Amino acid sequence: MERYDKERLVETVLYVLNKTGELDYYTLLKTIYFAELKHLAKWGQRITADDVCAMPYGPVLSHLLDAIKGDSHEPELSRMLKSAFKFASEDASNIMLPLRKANEDYLSESEKEALDASIQENASLSFEQLKNKSHDKIWLKNYREGKGKKGTGCRTIKQIHSRYKYTKSDCRNTTSRNIPHIPAR
């Protein structure tokens, strides 16, 4: 990921955490994921440039998940996130708290609208509700294909687009920054 994309990802995380006050990282990941789908469906562009991968509990932004868990191949992203949030305590090691306000200059109004809508729809859902909501046919196909194989199971943008019936001509104004090719890691 380019530095700008990492900064946007961190500011997106902070935006959601500032709006909610605190969130467990599973709910945070799903809230951002569903905002990505909303923004893609309406505008033909994603909010972040992170890879979306099929994991056992549904699709996730993979670089963000790895960085949150301290398992990142992106040390710069990990450092940036450490200065942006903290975990609540040892007893609540999955609850994230913001350490500063988000720099909203990194987000467009349409991106903030998609994030706000996703926060309203998803931030109060249980783990099970979020898991069920995110387990669709595309996730299942990618997860089955990649199960047990390191580096497989990532969704492609084409598959995400097809879910929302976008064609190449619908997305002609997109850029690689907004909608990257999502390679298998």
State the predicted function of each range.
Residues 1-185:
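Domain-edge interaction signal
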